[in-house]
């Protein structure tokens, strides 16, 4: 029989790996954004996005921009492709984090 704790930790490791992939894809997206749309890059604070003085409201703007699929009208196909990839990874990571929370609650109730 598979251990519940082993399964939970495996799920956590998969989630952490997907978070790292999401972070990496977001960095590449910002590099592409700097070249193809400097105004949007400034609008989402691309230069300070991953720094300690980054502005969360501007970071949320980029997440909202990608989540609402407003990138579909953009002129650069590479940017559109990267946004679709980041959106997919964001949805996957969100679902995995939700599954971890549900699993943690279930384990606390079970044990």
UniProtKB/Swiss-Prot annotation:
Organism superkingdom: Bacteria
Cellular location(s): Cell inner membrane
GO cellular component terms attached to this protein's record: plasma membrane
Recorded topology in the membrane: Multi-pass membrane protein
InterPro entries hit by this protein: Universal_stress_protein_B (IPR019598)
Statement: the UniProt record of this protein carries the keyword Transcription: no
TM ranges: 1-21, 90-110
UniProt keywords, alphabetically: Cell inner membrane, Cell membrane, Membrane, Transmembrane, Transmembrane helix
Family: Belongs to the universal stress protein B family.
Name of this chain's protein: Universal stress protein B
Organism in which the protein naturally occurs: Pectobacterium atrosepticum (strain SCRI 1043 / ATCC BAA-672)
Gene, per the UniProt record: uspB
């Amino acid at each position: 029989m598979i251990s519940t704790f082993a399964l939970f930790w495996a799920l956590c490791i998969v989630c952490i790996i997907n978070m790292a992939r999401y972070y990496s894809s977001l960095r590449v997206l910002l590099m592409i954004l700097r070249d193809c749309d400097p105004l949007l890059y400034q609008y989402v604070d691309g230069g300070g996005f991953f720094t300690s003085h980054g502005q969360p409201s501007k970071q949320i703007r980029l997440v909202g921009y990608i989540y609402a699929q407003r990138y579909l009208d953009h002129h650069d196909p590479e940017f559109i492709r990267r946004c679709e990839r980041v959106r997919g990874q964001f949805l996957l990571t969100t679902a995995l984090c939700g599954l971890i929370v549900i699993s943690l609650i279930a384990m606390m109730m079970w044990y």
